[in-house]
Structures are given as C-alpha cells and as structure tokens.
C-alpha cells in the first residue's frame, strides 16, 4: 500500500519486502516447513502406537479386558455364527 503523508506530500511504500514476512516464504521454505510438520506428526503417531510397548513382532502380555474381542463378537448381530444341529 502506498501511503501519502498529508503534511509533506511524500509517499511511502508500505509493501516493501522487509515489512511482510510472507514475501520471504518461498516454495522451498514452505516445503521444508511441511516436511518438518509431517515428520513430527509421524513421530507422534509412532510414539502413540508403541506407547504400551507392544508391536507385531513381540506382543506384550495384555490384561484380560485389554481387548474385549470376544464380547464384541458375541454382541455383533451381523456375524453369521454356525448353528449346531
């Protein structure tokens, strides 16, 4: 924006590169920021998924009600269970 001083009539360009930090945001800088955000998000997801210490290669001992799959399957009406004759 061009500002004109009413007293002196001098004009000042307020859109100079030093006044707006977005002018320094190049695509390369944006990609670096995006990569850092993605890496941090992946680290957080990894830490959350392995917070109880169990993974697919060495599953840890789980309490009895840790995964109530049996209860869930019994309560699911959409599972076709074989009937005894």
From Swiss-Prot:
Is the Repeat keyword given for this protein?
no
Query: Is Membrane there in the keyword field?
Result: yes
The lineage's top-level taxon is Viruses
Compartment list:
Virion membrane
**Disulfide bond residue pairs:** none
Q: Which InterPro entries match?
A: Baculo_ODV-E18
Q: What's a single GO CC term here?
A: membrane
According to its UniProt entry, the function of this protein is described as:
Component of the polyhedra envelope.
- Under which name does UniProt file this protein? Occlusion-derived virus envelope protein E18
Q: What is the lineage of its organism?
A: Viruses, Viruses incertae sedis, Naldaviricetes, Lefavirales, Baculoviridae
């Amino acid at each position: 924006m061009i500002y004109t001083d009413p007293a002196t009539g001098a004009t000042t360009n307020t859109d100079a590169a030093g006044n707006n930090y977005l002018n320094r945001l190049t695509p390369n800088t944006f990609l670096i920021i995006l990569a850092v955000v993605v890496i941090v998000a992946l680290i957080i997801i990894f830490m959350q998924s392995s917070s109880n210490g169990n993974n697919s290669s060495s599953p840890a001992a789980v309490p009895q009600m840790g995964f109530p799959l049996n209860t869930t399957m019994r309560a699911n009406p959409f599972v076709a269970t074989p009937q005894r004759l």
